Curated annotation (Swiss-Prot):
Lineage per the UniProt record: Bacteria, Pseudomonadati, Pseudomonadota, Alphaproteobacteria, Sphingomonadales
Alphabetically ordered keywords of this record: Cytoplasm, Methyltransferase, RNA-binding, rRNA processing, S-adenosyl-L-methionine, Transferase
Organism: Erythrobacter litoralis (strain HTCC2594)
EC number of the protein: 2.1.1.182
This protein's name: Ribosomal RNA small subunit methyltransferase A
Subcellular location: Cytoplasm
Gene, per the UniProt record: rsmA
Single GO MF descriptor: 16S rRNA (adenine(1518)-N(6)/adenine(1519)-N(6))-dimethyltransferase activity
Assigned GO CC terms: cytosol
CDD domains in UniProt: AdoMet_MTases
Function: Specifically dimethylates two adjacent adenosines (A1518 and A1519) in the loop of a conserved hairpin near the 3'-end of 16S rRNA in the 30S particle. May play a critical role in biogenesis of 30S subunits.
Keyword S-adenosyl-L-methionine on entry: yes
Origin superkingdom: Bacteria
Residues binding S-adenosyl-L-methionine, per UniProt: 25, 27, 52, 73, 99, 118
Amino acid sequence: MPELPPLRDVIAKHGLSASKALGQNFLFDAQLLDRIAGIPGGLENRAVLEIGPGPGGLTRALLKAGARVTAIEMDRRCLPALAELSEVYPGKLSVIHGDAMKLDHAELMGEPFAVVANLPYNVGTALFVRWLGGETWPPQWTSLTLMFQQEVAQRIVSTPGTSAYGRLAVLAQWRSAASMPMKVHRSAFTPPPKVMSAIVHVTPDEMPEGVSARTLERLTEAAFGQRRKMLRQSLKGVPGAVETLAEVAIEETRRAETVTVEEFVALARRLGASRPSSNSG
């Protein structure tokens, strides 16, 4: 195993500090980082995409686990520290200076890959929703192991009837399995954020037949966009949705937070079947 200087020394050497504008918080605890890198399991010689590696704390743990890492970093200040890591692990780390929101990750990776990242807080949810979207399923990613604020993590794994349950839960659970294997105390970060964090782990399941991802996304967006309203009000903007509720035994007086993932899937399937498709064959 290569001998690496302590991460704090690397940060001091390169004059790095976490950027609030970029939503950065650095993790130094090597044991904690090793545990995070261990969640996907069996990373030896597997392709891993990391977003926002910063000075490379989690990157070290992933390389130590044997992964081939592609890291996308927007902060130019962090590039020299990551370049040093590339030299220690030749051929194992590819660093891309760019905005992860503007890159095609599947095209970039060119093979099945796991995503493991301490996501910058300001783009984390948007990236997550993007990975969960699209009509092509299963996706090219084999698992997502992501650090979020604990409140966001709880929204992803929540169940109907709870205050945390909403659009994120439905998008994460309708064709994937989502869990929260680890909570991370705020004191583990530099600088310590105001809130606790947690790791979410997501693996793709089979795609339910006859359901369009776009239809489901539109339904959840409308339903949870006005979550205090009854479905007959909140779904008015989705053509045919209110009329279709009765066909799948969902009372129109219910609110979105009581509707299960399975019920949303059934509604999307029925809605798709009742409207002419633009795709032939």
